[in-house]
Amino acid sequence: MAIALEYVREIYYRPLLQLVYEAQTVHRQHHPPGRVQLCALVNIKSGRCPEDCAYCPQSARYSTGIETYPLISLESLRQQAMAAQRAGATRLCMGAAWRSAPAGEAFERVLEMVRLVRKLGMEACVTLGMVSAAQAQQLAAAGLTAYNHNLDTSPAFYPRIITTRTYRDRLETLAHVAAAGLQICCGGIVGLGESDEDRIGLLHVLANLTPPPTSVPINALVPVAGTPLGQLPPPDPLLLVRTIATARLLLPTAQIRLSAGRKNLSESEQALCFLAGANSIFTGERLLTTPNPGQAADAALLEKLGLQPL
């Protein structure tokens, strides 16, 4: 049965401390308390993307000074994956700055990357832009665990952030992923200039995906100079907490991943996010092209909070 927009709105606007308490209660019913999955994100192809996502430094339309490079080698991926695994990561996500996954040799190499990561005993996730039904089937056959394709924001606010790909395009890719039997990894970004109603709209769509996402990355905008949103301030951390808590109540069995923007959060603010139901983080010095707390800082934080890696 579909989850009503008004139901999502009612949850979102609950008093914050009550909302966090309820989210943590539900979290403990479905997940081991005090356990956090560590993930790593490898940028397997950087920059020169033809799209116009207003937040993204990898767009070829903006001058952001990022390092650009073509699809990396299998050996480079192997070294990065093994380093992440030694640091405690059990899931590796591979991101490529494409509008759509390409055909031919590049896609074949991605399939080899998936097989490599799975042979190491890690979960494998990729985010390659839009994929066809046939490509989703090939990724599943290679052993892919999950496909990431974020919705970013509400259907209403979306055209103000991206014009080169429609919301329907994104939902179509998610349908291909689901039809292939892959897990859906899908979330959004807080701090794009959206309203509370836009965050509610995003959560409403996420809660009604069929099947529901098993992984929900909640990102805080990292403003990057040169992008259209580069002058925005980082979002209020309590908006992030409210969004995470609402997501936890709507998607009780999902991994809620506290993703981009952690570098701008204090330890106390990150602790509130965990209390609100986040149970996964990305480790390493960078998330694609933006800074991220390093592994040493994350290890110290988890120890301070009494959290253990899954």
Curated annotation (Swiss-Prot):
Entry-linked InterPro entries:
Aldolase_TIM (IPR013785), BATS_dom (IPR010722), Biotin_synth/BioAB (IPR002684), Biotin_synthase (IPR024177), Elp3/MiaA/NifB-like_rSAM (IPR006638), rSAM (IPR007197)
Q: Does the record bear Iron in its keywords?
A: yes
Q: How is the cofactor bound?
A: Binds 1 [4Fe-4S] cluster. The cluster is coordinated with 3 cysteines and an exchangeable S-adenosyl-L-methionine.
Query: Which positions does UniProt annotate for [2Fe-2S] cluster binding?
Result: 93, 125, 185, 257
Q: What residues does [4Fe-4S] cluster bind to?
A: 49, 53, 56
Per the UniProt record, which EC number(s) apply here? 2.8.1.6
One Pfam family from the record: Radical_SAM
Q: Which domain of life is it from?
A: Bacteria
GO BP annotations, alphabetical order: biotin biosynthetic process
Q: Which GO terms describe its molecular function?
A: 2 iron, 2 sulfur cluster binding; 4 iron, 4 sulfur cluster binding; biotin synthase activity; iron ion binding
Does Iron count among this protein's keywords? Answer: yes
* Cofactor(s) recorded in Swiss-Prot or TrEMBL: [4Fe-4S] cluster; [2Fe-2S] cluster
Matching entries from Gene3D superfamilies are given as: Aldolase class I
Q: What keyword terms does UniProt attach to this protein? A: 2Fe-2S, 4Fe-4S, Biotin biosynthesis, Iron, Iron-sulfur, Metal-binding, S-adenosyl-L-methionine, Transferase
Boundaries of every Radical SAM core domain copy:
34-262
Q: In which pathway does it act?
A: Cofactor biosynthesis; biotin biosynthesis; biotin from 7,8-diaminononanoate: step 2/2
The reactions it catalyses are: (4R,5S)-dethiobiotin + (sulfur carrier)-SH + 2 reduced [2Fe-2S]-[ferredoxin] + 2 S-adenosyl-L-methionine = (sulfur carrier)-H + biotin + 2 5'-deoxyadenosine + 2 L-methionine + 2 oxidized [2Fe-2S]-[ferredoxin]
Report the NCBIfam families cross-referenced here: bioB
* Entry function: Catalyzes the conversion of dethiobiotin (DTB) to biotin by the insertion of a sulfur atom into dethiobiotin via a radical-based mechanism.
Q: Which family does it belong to?
A: Belongs to the radical SAM superfamily. Biotin synthase family.
Describe, as the record does, how this protein assembles with itself and its partners: Homodimer.
Q: What is this protein called?
A: Biotin synthase
Recorded source organism is Synechococcus sp. (strain JA-3-3Ab)
Originating gene:
bioB
